[in-house]
Amino acid sequence: MTTSTPSTTGMTSTADLSGLPAPRTVGTVYVTGGASGLGAAVVDAVLAAGGTPAVLDRAAPQREGVASLEVDLGDSAAAAEAVARLVEQVGPPTAVVTAAGTDACGPLTEIDPEAWEKVVRVNLFGTVAVVRAALPYLEEARGTVVTVGSTLSLRGMSDATAYSASKFGVRGFTHALAAEYAGRVGVTLLIPGGMRTAFFDGRTEQYKPGPDADLNDPRHTAATVITALQQPVGSEIREMLVMASGESSWP
């Protein structure tokens, strides 16, 4: 009598993942620009992940129960002071997400110099000021910084000299920070494409996305921030490009 062995053809095996470290808990996350746009989506994502968001913005967030301080992020001293006040209010951060941003469109010679420089102060200097003030707490917690660049961190665009300069600066700052704090603080650069937010409101029509523009849902972008924050200690996502599949500004 002969016996046959069942064929294993077509069967799949389950990988043993028991040795993998568990995702990190999302703790207290300071979010600049958390009152609107991507920042507000990050606040919601942090709450959904069981974390505690705290907002630094020029306006209060619409979501009730979220700690916040109104601050001009273009004022570096005020931004640093706001971080210290948030520590007293909600405790030290385990992560910082710098989602605040502004813009001034137009030819360089036609933009008011103060408006041009404000873009750099908010987007770059505001990012640096908040991160600098939070670093001692982040290092103690082995926390994470997520800065927000742009596809204009990767290439310049006509009539966007201020925004391009500020976002190239954020990218360079983030790369250098990652090298400086390697092994002590996680550092991630998020490069989002265009999103369906109020960021484009107030622009003249020539500087608004066209009717056929493929803009991403900010909630999708915010979800990737949570992925970065949940990386186990010793693992980091150094750079993320997140955009709608029809994004035209990159590559």
What label would you give each PLM region?
Residues 136, 178-180:
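Alpha-helical segment proximal to the catalytic Tyr-Lys
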Residues 131, 166:
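Active-site helix of classical SDR
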Residues 107-108, 115-117:
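Substrate-binding pocket helix/loop in short-chain dehydrogenase/reductase
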Residues 189-190, 209-250:
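C-terminal helical subdomain
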Residues 99-104:
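Conserved NAD(P)H cofactor-binding loop of Rossmann-fold oxidoreductase domains
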Residues 150:
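Residue(s) in the substrate-gating loop at a strand-loop-helix junction
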Residues 35-36:
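Conserved glycine-rich cofactor-binding loop
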